[in-house]
C-alpha cells in the first residue's frame, strides 16, 4: 500500500473532513491561523479521542503496511546482536529500531507519497469549501429579505458570538476590499455584501488588519444609517467582537456605539419626546428598537468589562467610563424640568429600562480601581447625574401618594417584563418615571456606601431651599418606605424585588452593615426620630399615616435591630434622650421601643397585632438586653416577665389542641397551628437571650422557663443554627454563661446537651471517623490533646468551670467501677468520663480503651483544669480520693531492676500526674509555689524536676517566704491606728483612713502586711459596724458558746479545705502546728451563725457552698487567733461588703428575696460578674472580644477568683490587700479589681485566644506580676465613672421592704 489510488484519495478526503468537523470548535476558537496550526499539531496530547478518529486509524494501518516488515527485520537483527532486551534495555531497543527504520529507504518513500497525496486532498477540500461558501452567501442574501427586522434578542445579544458560526480565515487584502466597499458613498447592496463577509470573518483577523481604523469609521457611519438592516448587521458584528477582542480595541468599538454626538443627534433628529398622559413609547418602533439594541449592547459590555479591565492600562478604563457618563448626562437640563412641561426621552431612561437596578454602576463601584475614576469624573464633570438621581427620588417621594394605586401594578408588570416581540413593547410615562426612580435609588444607595461618594453631599436641588444632606436623604427614603402601598392578598406571596419598600430596606441594610456609613447616615437624631415617629403616634392613641402598617413597622424594627447591633448605634438608642414620649418627657429611643413592645404584647395598641411584627420589636429589645449596658436600661420594665407571660399563654394554646377525630372539624387549621408553634418558639428564643449576661440569666431563672429555653437552645445547637441573623458567633458563650449556675447546669443536663458533648468527645477520642478507610489511617497525634478533640475538651472545660456544675453532675455519685467494659460501650455522662478516662484504677478500664495513653492524657488534662477550682477539687478528692490514685499511679510507673529501687519511667502520663500532684498539694500565688512543666527538655536529662510519689512535696516546688520587717511606713499606719484608739472616731475618720491607706499603697504597699494590716482591718470593721448608716444588714443575735458548736461536725469537703488552709498558713508561717482545732472551731461558729439566717429551700437546687475560703483567709490574716477572727466576721456580717467578699454569707439567705434565695444564683455572679463584663466591654474592649471569640466568659473566671478569694492566683500580700481594699474603699472595688486583673492580662489573653486555649490559661496560670497597689489609681478612676451605678445595684440585692 505504498501508492494511493483514486479511491484511496477520495476516502482520505472524507476521513479528513470528518476529523476537521470533530475539532471544529477548537479551531474556530483560535484567535489566529498560527494558533489553529498549534492546536492541530498538539491534538494527540490534548484530545483523548485522538486515536479513535477514523482518519488516524487509516494512517496507522498505512504506516504498518508500509513499514511493518522493516521494523521486524531491524528488531530481529538487534536482539541477535545484544541478546534479549529486558529491564532498562527495553528503551535502547526501541530507540535503535526507530532510528534505523527512519533512515531506511522504505520510510523516505512512504513519507514522500503521503505528502503528495495529502497536498492533493487538502487542495481539493479548499476548492470545495470556497464553492460551498459562495453558495451559502447567495442563500443568505435571499433569506435575509424574508427575515424580521426586529430580532432584538437574537441579533443584538453578545451571546450570539461569531464563534457559533462557520467561517474561513481571511486575508488582509480581502479586508481592505471590504473596508472600501463599506464606504458610505457605495450602493446599499455593496455595503450589505461587505457586512455579510465581515460577519463571517474571524474578529481577530479583522481587528489586526492595517485597514481597521478606516473600517471602524465606516462601521460607525453604517450604525447610524437609516436602513435598519445595515445598522443591525453592524451591531451584530460589534457584539461578536466584544467577546473576543482585547480592551484597547473594544473600547474603540464601545466609543463608536456610544458616540455622544451621534446619539444626541439621533435623539434630537427623531424628536424622541418623553411620553405624557396616556401616551407611551413603543419598543417595536424602528427608531426606538435600534436605540434599545444599541443601549442594550452597551449595557451588556458595561457589566462584563469589569472582569478584565484591571489587566489593561487605566486610560482605557477611563475612556470607557467617560464615554458612558457623558452619554448618560445628555439633556440633563431639560430632563429634570417640571412635570408639567414637555420632556425629552434621554439615554438615562433607556438604560434604566434595560438595567433597572443599575447593575452596571454597582459593578463599577465595587472595585477601588474603577471606583476612584468614576467618582473623580462624577465630581469634575458629571455631577448632574447624581443631582438628577436625587431629584428623581425627591420627585417620587412628593408624588408617591398620587401614584400609590398604580405602583403595585407597575412593579408586577416590570418584574416580569421581557423586551421584544414575545414580551412587553409599550411603556407609559409613569412606568418610565418609576424605573428611573428605581435606577436612581440604586445608584444613590451604592454611592453613599463609600467615603468619597458621601462627600457629594449636601447637594443643591430644585424646589428645595436648603441643600439635601445625607441625613435628609435617609429620612426621605424611610418616608418612601412608609408610603409604599399595602399589597393585595393575591400579591403578598410575590417577591416584589422592585418595590420601593424592599429597595429602601436594601439600602438601609447595606448602610447598617458598614460602620462608617452607619455613623454618617443612620446614627443621627433625625433618622431615629423618623424611624420612631409611628411608634410615638401609636403610643399617644392615634394612627400614623402608613399605607401598610404591619409592613412599615416590621421594616422599622428590622432597621432598629441592625442599629442596635453596633456599639455606636446601641449607645445612641440607650443614652441619647432627644425623643419626646407620649407623656411629653424627653426619653431615649430604648425606653420608647420597650414601652411600645410591652403594649404590643399586651395588645393595647390600635394596630392589627401580628406575631411577626411583635417578634420584630422584641428582637430589637433583645439586641439591647443581651448586653450588660442594655439590660441595665431596660431592667425596670420587667420585659422578661412580659415575654414569659406571652409564652405561657401561647404554650397553653398549643397544648389545648385536641387530638384530631375522624369526621370532626379541626380545632385549629394546620397553618394556624404552625403559626402558634412558630410564635411560641420565637418567644422562647427571645427569652433565652436573657442568658447572654449574668444578671439576665438570673431574670430568666425567675421566669421559670429556663428548662424550656435551654431545651430550645439545644435543638438549635444540634442543627448548627445561628443565634440570630445579627450574631456572629454560635451558642458557645450562652452555654458557658448558663453552665456557671446550678439551675443552668441542671437545665443543660435535662435537655441532653451534656450527653451530646460527651458522646461527641468519645467519638472523636476513641472511635475516630467511621468513613476513613484502613488505607488512609489516622495520623498519630503529636499534641497531648489532638486537634480533633480540642473543641470537645474546651466545651467540657466551659461546662465544668463552676463548682456548681461539678456538684450537680458528680455530687454523691459513685463510680461504676465495672469488672468488665464492652468495647462498644460509649461514655454518655460526665460520670462515665470520670470513670473511663480519669480514675483508671483497673486493668479492665485500661483494656476498654482503644487509645489508652491518649485518652488517659486527655482525662488527666481535664482533671488538671477542674482541680484549679479549689471547691471542685475538694468535692472530687472527698468522693474519689484522687490524690491516693495519682500517687499509686506514680509508684506503679517505675522500672523493676534486679536489685535496689527502680527508676521512674518518664512518659506523658507520669509527667501529667506529677504536674497535677504538685498543683493540688502546693498552695500559693505565682511567687509562692513552682509547678513542673509538662514538656520535656533536650539533652541527657529530659525531665530534671523531682517526681512525686509520696507526700509531703519535695522542697524544690515550694519557695521560701521572705521575712516581714517593720518599717517607717508600717509605723505610720500603726501611729494612725493608735491615735484613733485614743480619740473618739467621728464621721470623718473613715475618709482619713481611706486617704492614709491610699497614700501607703501608692508609696510602699509591700509594707502593708502582718499584724498592722490585721489591726487596720479590725478597726475599720469595728468603726463601720458601729455606725447605723454604714450597717447594711440588720443585727443578728448570736451568742458565742464553744461547747454548743463543738458538737457540730464538718463535712469531708470542709475537712479537706481545713487541711489546705492549714498547709498554706504554715507555709506562710502565720499558723502554729496546733491551729487545726481553732480553724475548725471558727468554721463551726460561722456555720452556726449563718444557718440561723437561711431560708428553708424548697428547690432541689441548694447549690454547692464548698469551703469557706474567706473565713480561712481572715483566720490566716489574724495569725490563727480564733477569737479575733470570729469577732471580726460577726461584725463584718452587718456590712454590705460581706455580701460579696464572703460567699456563704448570702447562701440561701433570709436577707435575699425568696425567689433569688431559692435560685442558687449568688449575687457575686448576678451582680459583681455582671458589672465586670459591662465595664470590661467599655474599658478593655479587646479583652471582652477575645472572651466572646473563645466561647468563654469573664464572669466564669471572676466567680472562680472571688469564690476562693484569689487563692493560688495571687500571692498572700496581694490577697490581704484585695480584702482590705474592698472593705475600706467599698465593695464595688471587687468589680474594679477583676477588671484591673483582666486588663493586666490583656496581652496574654489575646495571645491565648489565638492558640485557642484561653480557658485553660486563665484557670491554670496565676496572675503573674499583678500588684493591687499598681492598679489602685486605675480603680479609683473606675470608681469615679461607675460607682453610682455599681454600688447602687449592689445595695439593691435586699428586698425593697428591707
From Swiss-Prot:
**SUPFAM superfamilies referenced in this protein's UniProt entry, alphabetically:** Ypt/Rab-GAP domain of gyp1p
Q: Which UniProt keywords apply?
A: Cell projection, Cilium, Cytoplasm, Developmental protein
Top-level taxon = Eukaryota
Question: After gene disruption, what is the outcome?
Answer: Fish are viable during embryogenesis and early larval stages, but exhibit curvature of the body axis and hydrocephalus, and curled cilia in distal kidney tubules.
Q: Where in the cell is it found?
A: Cytoplasm; Cell projection, Cilium
Known partners and oligomeric status: Interacts with cdk20, which promotes cdk20 stability and function.
* Gene it is expressed from: tbc1d32
| InterPro entries per UniProt | BROMI_C (IPR055392), BROMI_M (IPR032735), BROMI_N (IPR055391), PHAF1/BROMI (IPR039156), Rab-GAP_TBC_sf (IPR035969)
Q: Name one GO cellular component term.
A: cytoplasm
Q: What's the protein name?
A: Protein broad-minded
An individual GO BP term: cilium assembly
Free-text function comment from the UniProt entry: Required for high-level Shh responses in the developing neural tube. Together with cdk20, controls the structure of the primary cilium by coordinating assembly of the ciliary membrane and axoneme, allowing gli2 to be properly activated in response to SHH signaling.
Every copy of the Rab-GAP TBC domain together lies at 1171-1283
Q: What PANTHER family is this protein classified in? A: PROTEIN BROAD-MINDED (PTHR13465:SF3), UPF0183 PROTEIN (PTHR13465)
Amino acid at each position: 500500500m505504498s501508492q494511493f489510488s483514486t479511491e484511496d484519495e477520495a476516502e482520505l478526503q472524507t476521513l479528513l473532513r470528518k476529523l476537521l468537523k470533530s475539532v471544529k470548535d477548537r479551531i474556530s476558537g483560535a484567535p489566529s491561523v498560527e494558533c489553529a496550526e498549534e492546536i492541530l499539531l498538539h491534538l494527540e496530547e490534548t484530545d483523548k479521542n485522538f486515536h479513535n478518529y477514523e482518519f488516524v486509524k487509516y494512517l496507522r494501518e498505512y504506516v504498518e503496511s508500509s513499514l511493518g516488515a522493516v521494523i521486524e527485520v531491524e528488531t530481529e537483527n538487534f536482539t541477535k546482536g545484544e541478546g534479549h532486551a529486558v529491564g532498562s534495555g527495553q528503551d535502547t531497543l526501541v530507540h535503535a529500531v526507530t532510528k534505523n527504520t527512519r533512515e531506511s529507504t522504505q520510510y523516505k518513500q512512504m513519507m514522500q507519497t503521503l505528502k503528495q497525496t495529502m497536498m492533493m486532498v487538502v487542495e481539493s477540500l479548499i476548492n470545495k469549501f470556497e464553492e460551498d461558501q459562495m453558495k451559502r452567501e447567495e442563500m443568505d442574501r435571499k433569506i435575509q429579505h424574508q427575515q424580521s427586522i426586529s430580532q432584538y434578542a437574537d441579533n443584538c445579544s453578545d451571546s450570539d458570538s461569531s464563534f457559533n458560526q462557520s467561517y474561513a480565515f481571511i486575508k488582509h487584502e480581502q479586508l481592505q476590499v471590504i473596508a472600501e466597499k463599506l464606504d458610505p458613498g457605495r450602493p446599499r447592496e455593496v455595503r450589505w455584501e461587505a457586512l455579510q463577509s465581515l460577519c463571517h470573518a474571524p474578529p481577530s483577523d479583522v481587528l489586526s488588519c492595517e485597514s481597521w481604523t478606516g473600517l471602524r469609521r465606516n462601521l460607525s457611519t453604517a450604525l447610524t444609517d437609516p436602513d435598519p438592516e445595515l445598522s443591525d448587521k453592524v451591531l451584530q458584528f460589534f457584539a461578536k467582537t466584544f467577546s473576543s477582542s482585547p480592551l484597547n480595541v473594544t473600547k474603540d468599538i464601545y466609543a463608536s456605539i456610544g458616540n455622544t454626538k451621534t446619539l444626541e443627534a439621533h435623539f434630537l433628529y427623531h424628536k424622541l419626546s418623553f411620553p405624557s398622559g396616556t401616551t407611551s413609547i413603543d419598543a417595536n418602533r424602528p427608531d426606538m428598537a435600534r436605540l434599545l439594541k444599541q443601549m442594550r449592547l452597551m449595557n451588556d459590555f458595561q457589566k462584563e468589562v469589569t472582569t478584565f479591565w484591571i489587566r489593561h492600562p487605566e486610560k482605557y478604563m477611563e475612556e470607557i467610563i467617560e464615554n458612558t457618563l457623558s452619554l448618560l448626562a445628555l439633556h440633563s437640563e431639560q430632563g429634570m424640568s417640571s412635570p408639567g412641561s414637555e420632556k425629552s426621552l434621554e439615554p438615562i431612561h433607556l438604560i434604566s429600562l434595560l438595567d433597572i437596578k443599575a447593575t452596571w454602576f454597582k459593578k463599577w463601584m465595587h472595585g477601588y480601581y474603577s471606583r476612584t475614576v468614576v467618582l473623580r469624573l462624577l465630581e469634575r464633570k458629571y455631577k448632574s447625574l447624581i443631582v438628577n438621581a436625587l431629584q428623581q427620588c425627591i420627585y417620587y417621594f412628593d408624588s408617591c401618594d398620587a401614584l400609590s394605586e398604580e405602583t403595585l401594578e407597575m412593579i408586577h408588570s416590570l418584574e416580569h417584563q421581557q423586551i421584544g416581540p414575545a414580551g412587553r413593547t409599550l411603556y407609559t410615562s409613569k412606568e418610565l418615571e418609576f424605573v428611573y426612580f428605581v435606577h436612581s435609588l440604586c445608584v444613590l444607595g451604592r454611592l453613599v456606601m463609600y467615603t468619597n461618594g458621601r462627600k457629594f453631599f449636601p447637594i443643591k436641588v430644585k424646589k428645595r431651599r436648603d441643600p439635601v444632606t445625607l441625613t435628609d436623604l435617609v429620612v426621605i427614603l424611610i418616608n418612601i418606605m412608609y408610603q409604599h402601598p399595602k399589597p393585595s392578598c393575591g400579591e403578598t406571596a410575590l417577591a416584589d424585588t422592585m418595590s420601593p419598600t424592599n429597595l429602601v430596606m436594601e439600602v438601609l441594610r447595606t448602610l447598617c452593615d458598614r460602620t462608617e456609613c452607619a455613623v454618617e447616615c443612620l446614627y443621627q437624631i433625625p433618622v431615629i426620630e423618623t424611624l420612631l415617629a409611628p411608634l410615638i403616634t401609636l403610643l399617644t392613641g392615634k394612627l400614623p399615616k402608613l399605607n401598610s402598617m404591619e409592613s412599615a413597622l416590621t421594616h422599622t424594627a428590622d432597621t432598629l435591630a441592625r442599629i442596635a447591633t453596633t456599639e455606636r448605634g446601641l449607645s445612641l438608642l440607650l443614652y441619647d434622650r432627644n425623643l419626646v414620649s407620649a407623656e411629653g418627657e424627653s426619653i431615649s429611643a430604648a425606653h420608647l421601643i420597650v414601652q411600645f413592645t410591652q403594649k404590643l404584647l399586651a395588645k393595647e395598641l390600635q394596630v392589627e397585632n401580628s406575631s411577626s411584627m411583635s417578634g420584630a420589636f422584641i428582637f430589637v429589645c433583645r439586641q439591647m438586653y443581651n448586653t450588660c449596658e442594655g439590660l441595665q436600661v431596660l431592667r425596670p420594665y420587667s420585659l422578661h416577665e412580659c415575654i414569659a407571660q406571652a409564652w405561657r399563654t401561647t404554650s397553653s394554646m398549643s397544648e389545648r389542641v385536641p387530638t384530631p377525630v375522624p369526621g370532626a372539624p379541626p380545632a385549629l387549621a394546620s397553618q394556624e397551628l404552625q403559626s402558634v408553634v412558630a410564635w411560641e418558639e420565637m418567644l422562647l428564643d427571645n427569652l433565652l437571650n436573657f442568658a447572654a449576661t449574668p444578671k439576665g440569666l438570673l431574670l430568666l431563672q425567675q421566669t421559670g422557663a429556663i428548662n424550656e429555653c435551654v431545651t430550645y437552645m439545644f435543638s438549635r445547637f444540634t442543627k448548627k443554627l445561628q443565634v440570630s441573623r445579627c450574631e456572629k458567633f454560635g451558642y458557645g458563650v450562652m452555654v458557658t454563661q448558663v453552665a456557671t449556675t446550678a439551675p443552668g447546669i441542671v437545665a443543660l443536663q435535662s435537655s441532653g446537651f451534656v450527653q451530646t458533648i460527651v458522646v461527641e468527645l468519645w467519638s472523636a477520642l476513641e472511635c475516630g471517623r467511621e468513613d476513613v478507610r484502613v488505607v488512609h489511617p489516622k495520623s498519630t497525634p503529636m499534641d497531648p490533646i489532638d486537634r480533633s478533640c480540642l473543641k470537645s475538651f474546651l466545651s467540657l472545660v466551659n461546662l465544668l468551670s463552676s463548682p456548681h456544675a461539678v456538684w450537680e453532675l458528680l455530687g454523691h455519685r459513685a463510680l461504676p467501677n465495672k469488672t468488665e467494659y464492652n468495647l462498644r460501650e460509649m461514655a454518655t455522662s460526665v460520670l462515665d468520663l470520670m470513670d473511663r478516662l480519669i480514675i483508671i484504677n483497673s486493668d479492665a478500664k485500661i483494656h476498654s480503651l482503644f487509645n489508652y495513653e491518649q485518652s488517659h492524657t486527655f482525662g488527666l488534662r481535664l482533671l488538671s483544669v477542674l482541680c484549679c477550682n479549689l471547691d471542685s477539687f475538694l468535692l472530687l478528692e472527698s468522693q474519689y480520693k484522687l490524690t491516693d490514685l495519682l500517687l499509686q499511679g506514680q509508684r506503679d510507673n517505675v522500672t523493676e531492676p534486679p536489685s535496689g529501687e527502680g527508676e521512674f519511667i518518664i512518659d506523658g502520663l507520669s509527667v501529667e500526674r506529677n504536674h497535677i500532684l504538685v498543683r493540688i498539694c502546693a498552695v500559693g500565688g505565682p511567687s509562692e509555689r513552682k509547678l513542673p512543666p509538662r514538656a520535656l527538655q533536650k539533652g541527657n536529662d529530659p525531665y530534671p524536676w523531682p517526681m512525686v510519689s509520696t507526700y509531703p512535696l519535695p522542697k524544690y516546688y515550694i519557695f521560701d517566704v521572705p521575712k516581714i520587717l517593720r518599717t517607717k511606713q508600717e509605723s505610720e499606719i500603726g501611729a494612725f491606728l493608735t491615735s484613733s484608739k485614743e480619740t473618739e472616731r467621728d464621721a470623718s475618720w473613715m475618709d482619713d483612713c481611706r486617704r492614709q491607706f491610699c497614700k501607703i499603697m501608692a508609696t510602699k504597699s509591700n509594707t502593708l502586711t502582718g499584724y498592722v494590716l490585721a489591726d487596720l482591718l479590725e478597726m475599720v470593721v469595728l468603726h463601720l459596724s458601729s455606725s447605723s448608716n454604714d450597717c447594711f444588714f440588720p443585727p443578728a443575735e448570736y451568742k458565742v458558746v464553744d461547747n454548743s458548736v463543738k458538737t457540730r461536725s464538718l463535712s469531708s469537703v470542709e475537712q479537706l479545705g481545713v487541711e489546705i488552709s492549714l498547709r498554706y498558713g504554715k507555709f506562710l508561717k502565720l499558723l502554729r502546728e496546733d491551729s487545726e482545732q481553732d480553724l475548725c472551731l471558727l468554721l463551726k461558729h460561722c456555720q452556726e451563725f449563718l444557718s440561723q439566717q437561711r431560708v428553708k429551700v424548697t428547690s432541689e437546687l441548694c447549690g454547692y457552698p464548698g469551703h469557706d475560703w474567706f473565713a480561712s483567709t481572715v483566720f490566716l490574716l489574724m495569725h490563727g487567733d480564733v477569737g479575733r477572727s470570729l469577732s471580726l466576721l460577726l461584725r463584718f456580717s452587718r456590712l454590705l461588703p460581706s455580701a460579696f467578699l464572703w460567699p456563704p454569707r448570702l447562701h440561701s439567705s433570709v436577707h435575699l428575696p425568696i425567689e433569688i434565695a431559692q435560685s442558687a444564683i449568688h449575687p457575686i455572679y448576678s451582680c459583681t460578674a455582671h458589672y465586670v463584663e459591662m465595664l470590661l466591654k467599655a474599658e478593655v474592649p479587646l479583652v471582652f472580644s477575645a472572651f466572646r471569640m473563645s466561647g468563654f466568659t469573664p464572669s466564669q473566671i471572676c466567680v472562680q477568683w472571688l469564690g476562693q478569694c484569689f487563692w493560688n492566683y495571687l500571692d498572700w500580700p496581694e490577697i490581704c490587700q484585695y480584702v482590705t481594699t474592698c472593705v475600706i474603699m467599698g465593695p464595688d472595688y471587687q468589680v474594679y479589681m477583676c477588671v484591673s486583673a483582666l486588663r493586666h492580662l490583656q496581652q496574654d489573653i489575646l495571645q491565648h485566644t489565638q492558640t485557642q486555649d484561653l480557658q485553660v490559661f486563665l484557670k491554670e496560670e496565676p496572675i503573674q506580676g499583678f500588684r493591687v497597689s499598681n492598679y489602685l489609681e486605675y480603680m479609683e478612676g473606675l470608681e469615679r465613672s461607675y460607682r453610682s451605678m455599681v454600688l447602687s445595684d449592689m445595695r439593691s440585692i435586699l428586698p425593697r421592704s428591707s
